[in-house]
Amino acid sequence: MKNIPGLRYLAILAMVCCFFLNFMIYREYGASLQAKPEGTAQVAQKAEPEAAVPPSNGELRRPAEYRGIYLHNYSARMPKILADYVTKAKQHGVNTLVLDMQDAVYFRPGEIPQQNVALCLSNGIWPVARIVVFPYGLKEYPVPQSLIADRMALARKAVSLGFREIQFDYIRFEDSGRLRQVGQEERYRMVEGFLSNARRELSAKGIVVSADVFGRVALNRHDPIGQRLEGLDNAVDVILPMAYPSHYTWSRFMIANPYYTLYKSSVVARDRLKKAQLVMYIQGFEMRVAPSGLSLPVYIAHQMQACVDARIGGWIVWNAAQNYGPTWDALKLMAAKSPIPGIEAARAATAREERSAESQATGTRTPATKKRTEGNRA
């Protein structure tokens, strides 16, 4: 009986922890679950409908120009939440939803109801299943075959649910200098081999295969993470560089000029690819937006317009917190008859930067070129 006070303490602590956990879950998801969005797309009334035959592709084809947003696994699993995004997507001209097949913390599979994928298809929305291959990059080599088998099993599961595209992310080596014993060409062979094998199997079922790559891979060659555009061009149908301006920390100019960053990355990558469709992931979050002097909606719209001007295969907005209010506002700016605020100045700055780069390449440096070069040293 001497342990009773201790047991009471543990019981009270457990109750407090449970209360806190429930509070956090409600704060994160409760409002969206209780509120019925205006104009929500129709969803099945049954909570757990019987499994149906996966919907056929019908007339829905891979978009010639992707206009998409990313949704994490929780949003993808909840019918009411997903229906709200489908409704907003249709209202604003979004034709693609990238849905996580795994949770974002432990990368464990999270079951997406088949009816949710069918909802996308029936509303003309292209559903893409995102699968993280090597969380935060490959840390051991050779690659465990059990891991490869697990990822391919998840891809097959996505196909059975009706997904029309499998998007592999984190298909790279860790960006930390580990595994130095693995040579550059071997890294390429591993990454491209996995994707080629996946495509060989999935394309036989009419499934599109895509891969996310670092934004810098669009601009460089011989990247140690094992990604190169020329090799991936033969391994997948769609390549998606994650060209978030906030991540180009070596260039103040690229951080402060989202139009230039996306336009430059898009044009260089476009000219290097011969087969694969090029789609850019663009930044839909606040990180390092301030140096641009733009509001977030305008910042996003500049990136969208850069993709249009570069004549590539579209864009997908990334916001891990699912805060897409600024993205909807950006799309309103894109649809408006009046020019996007600051877009002409951004185009002019891009043209000047391109001329400066040409001057550097030919060795004819001007004072303006020298100033810009020094400004790029972050």
Predicted features, each with a name:
Residues T96-V133, S176-V209:
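Aromatic-lined substrate-binding rim segments of carbohydrate-active enzymes
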Residues I81-V105, S160-I166, V238, C307-W315:
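Catalytic domains of carbohydrate-active enzymes, especially glycoside hydrolases
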Residues A243-Y244, P258-Y259, A276-E353:
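Substrate-binding cleft of secreted/luminal carbohydrate-active enzymes
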Residues L99, I225-Y259, W318-N323:
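Aromatic- and acid-rich polysaccharide-binding/catalytic face
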Residues A31-A89, A211, Q283-F285:
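Boundary/entry segment of secreted carbohydrate-active catalytic domains
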Residues Y70, V128-P135, Y188-G226, L273-E286:
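Aromatic-lined carbohydrate-recognition surfaces of secreted/lumenal glycan-active proteins
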Residues V98, R151-E185, I316:
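Active-site groove signature of glycoside hydrolases
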Residues R61-Y70, Y74-P79, I112-S122, W126-L161, ...:
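Active-site-adjacent "subsite" loops/lids of carbohydrate-active enzymes
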